[in-house]
Amino acid sequence: MTRRFALLLALAACSKTVQPAADQPAQTGIQLGDLDRKAAPCDDFYEFSNGTWRAQNPIPASMDRWSRRWQSGEQNKEKLKIILDELSAKTDWPAGSIEKQVGDFNAACMDEAKADALGLAPLKPMLAELDAVRTPADVQVAIRKLTDLNIAAPFGFGPTSDPHEPSRTIAALGAGGLGLPDRDYYLKPEPRFVEAREKYHAHLKTMFALAGLTDSPEQVFAFEKRLAEASLDNVALRNPKNLDHPMPFDELVKLTPHFDWVAFYKAGKVEKADLNVAEPGFMKAFDRELQETSPAEWRGYLKWKVLAASAPWLSKPFADESFNFNQKFLGGVGEKKPRGVRCAELTDQLLGEALGKKYVERYFPPAAKARVQELVKNELSAMKEIIEHLDWMTPETKKKAVHKVETFNPKVGYPDKWRDYSGVHVKRDALLANIAEGQKWEVAFEHGTMGKPTNRDFWGMTPPTSNAYYNPLLNEIVFPAGILIPPAFDVNASDAVNYGAIGVVIGHEISHGFDDQGAQFDADGRLQNWWTEQDLKQFQDRTSCVANQYDGYFIKPGVHHNGRLVLGESIGDLAGARVAYLAFQKALAAHPFKPADGFTPEQEFFVAWGQFRGDQIREETQLLMIQGDPHPVARFRVIGPLSNLTEFQKAWSCPAQSAMVRPNRCDVW
């Protein structure tokens, strides 16, 4: 698994959401049958809003978690599968058309029998090239080839908006190259990490044996451990300043003198210009490995990176072993998803805007886009009002914060300009070659943006994606069509339900512009302080309250959230709920209504939020989240923010001593 370093994309993404199957009616309101009436809303609102649903909906064997959102997300992939099956069934699409590209890619992916018959054969030419590595110069050529395949071995290389001049795109280097989820899995002594290392050792040995590799799995693990020792931990990675190391090309050469960056840049057709090195310490360690690690050890490591990346799409023994370690052991998943669903995910990954264009034509009506744009507009207005009424911020900082809200760039549904995939050459009978072709094209596309003005039309997610994000470098909030579906959003739902579900997501993403990361970027996306000293101290004190709150949330005895790791998402949840609620109150004043479900409109808003966030998560997945995911687990994404909101207490008439009323509330925005 490669590590995401923040300045490559700087995406603050919310958790996944979902869409109903074609043969199910749209759910336009809260689900009364999912409530647990035995649970008092003022004692445990998560159980009250989700208890019956959770009791009646076990996690499917192929999933690491389950919820209404995830259920609809999987049904959404079934919609992609319908499109793909239709396109791949026809073989005479015009040459170069997106229908032919997408259809042929899916046809190659779906031919599991051919993959099983071929075994390792599709990968043998690449493994043979790597097996020929004998000198330090050969190692560097191999690293360049793997970079072209979008494999971080061991560093990641990609574009980013310059954090000091976001109007231009520069190159960025970051740490990568690990096979375990993060550095702590290699270094920490706790039993779960020790077990993971033992399982990973066994996994390496099994995969090497399947591929007939004679390289040393022990040397590969030792190599990765040294990389881990040089990497920042997950909390440090959340601070943009820890990743901000701009330098000219010549300084990079001095930092890592044993790597031929001139040849690397020339091979990637990248200009030798200024760049950002996210983790200079890691790059120094990389340079030491070039000096001290033998070509034979490098050879084994590089072959492993290619094998690990390809295994899910090779024959059954490789695919099963990859699944058994990465999904079954690490995530607790019992079985693979159906091949068609996995192929839909792969096509979306590599040809996402081509497939996405077909998706929005069929499933995302103009009325839905217009309604979401209206919600976004209303919530940006609400955020401005909240800032203007803060009692702890000086007028000087308020003015800059309001200006930042006014310069937000919302994107809804799909891009105005679609990407042209005509340069991607797809064969109907060569899956691994198609994957390599898609990755090479994506890398070349990214390299082509470096040294040029930032493309503000670019989307960091594909239209069918069930997610959303805020990019601080561009001060933009992005909501793909894939998230704008029930239960997150329904054009026919009440304001209470829409503001309580997608509205809180919108508020969450807006609030990322003012969380512990986003607050370090100004309205133009520059990484620079825009706060007075007094206001910054107030902000940090208030965010520390949130971090301390989440430090106290345990998923099992001895295992709790790291409040600093989840701080940005927790601020987003708290402020996002407040922003959405204020916008909802204004909508309610303009268009009063009385719900037919026995709740007040305000209560319906909070039930919609609780049900949107409710889910089931396997313990193994929760442990992964606790370790490296900046999002809290679902239960704490409900009770955490709501227990701080006076609006919630008032809506449910909660006594001051209730469990859902914190005695010392955290209040940031």
Spans of model-derived segments:
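N-terminal low-complexity, Pro/Thr/Ser-rich intrinsically disordered segments
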Residues: 19-31, 35
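Noncatalytic, helix-rich "gating/capping" subdomain that lines the substrate-entry/channel surface
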Residues: 87-378
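Hydrophobic/aromatic-rich, well-ordered segments within soluble, folded domains that form packed cores
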Residues: 34-55, 186, 190-209, 567, ...
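Bacterial signal peptide processing site
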Residues: 15-17
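Intrinsically disordered, low-complexity linker/terminal regions across diverse proteins
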Residues: 220, 226, 255-258, 276, ...
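C-terminal motif of bacterial Sec signal peptides marking the signal peptidase cleavage site
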Residues: 11-13
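Active-site-surrounding "flap" and adjacent substrate/cofactor-binding loops of secreted or lumenal enzymes
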Residues: 23-26, 39-44, 48-116
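Sec-dependent signal peptide recognition
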Residues: 2-8
